[in-house]
């Protein structure tokens, strides 16, 4: 019998716990939750194990602490949420100094015990944290990716669907750039079941949707008061992991290393990529007009500034 895949979730907070539940329900593979608070990881793992009977799914969920990364040994996928979440008043950039140390330690653990893993980074500020993961692990560019664009696009899909009175599932959308206030929702490449957005919504509504998408994470932070979004980020990362583990070759907007595409070199920026068994198998380059290129360049400049602060 074929051996089940193994998914390591590093960080057992709100996103980590939701990731574990979704991975279990989809039976993507056995799950190991790892956290600096070992009891939290083990407690959530046990809670999830006790869900299997009623949920009708059969993969194991175990927990462990960050004092012993050997529990992630030979993981096929590592999804990293370690670090602190945004708090009200904090920008993603404020998080950099706090979370860089955590990511560096995690990267060393992954490099030692899961050297062949496909690594998905969720920790913010995303584009600099995924860059740090790439530099510290030394993994090839196709095996390190950041979860940003899938989430940003999902938010855009919901806002469009809500405004147009249609299912978000029928909204085709694309968001480029960094995971921050300078992200670039591409209206020209977005539609509802093939119908251009401009046929369904006026410019004022579309402009408001673009702005709300850019501020989407902050909106939830303000409402929660004690943390940041976790359901949609977890679902977005699971879509990426599933495409890799099941070789689905989905086209997903992710933070990937660019080597000349879109005029960018040596940075992780949100672009459409194909994710399959080879990891990030290719970057799809869209034709941009002058306005879109200018917006993307502003986003890239923000990413460049954030990455420079890592000093890696």
From Swiss-Prot:
One of its GO terms (biological process) is tricarboxylic acid cycle. NAD(+) binds at residues 11-16, 35, 99, 122-124. The active site is at 179 (proton acceptor). The keyword NAD applies. It comes from the Bacteria. GO terms for molecular function: L-lactate dehydrogenase activity; L-malate dehydrogenase (NAD+) activity. It holds the Pfam family Ldh_1_C. Gene3D superfamilies: Lactate dehydrogenase/glycoside hydrolase, family 4, C-terminal, NAD(P)-binding Rossmann-like Domain. It catalyses: (S)-malate + NAD(+) = oxaloacetate + NADH + H(+). The keyword NAD applies. CDD domains: LDH-like_MDH. Keywords: NAD, Oxidoreductase, Tricarboxylic acid cycle. Its EC number is 1.1.1.37. Substrate binds at residues 86, 92, 124, 155. InterPro entries: L-lactate/malate_DH, Lactate/malate_DH_C, Lactate/malate_DH_N, Lactate_DH/Glyco_Ohase_4_C, Malate_DH_type3, NAD(P)-bd_dom_sf. Belongs to the LDH/MDH superfamily. MDH type 3 family. Catalyzes the reversible oxidation of malate to oxaloacetate. HAMAP family: Malate_dehydrog_3 (MF_00487). This is Malate dehydrogenase 1. The lineage of its organism: Bacteria, Pseudomonadati, Myxococcota, Myxococcia, Myxococcales. The gene is mdh1.
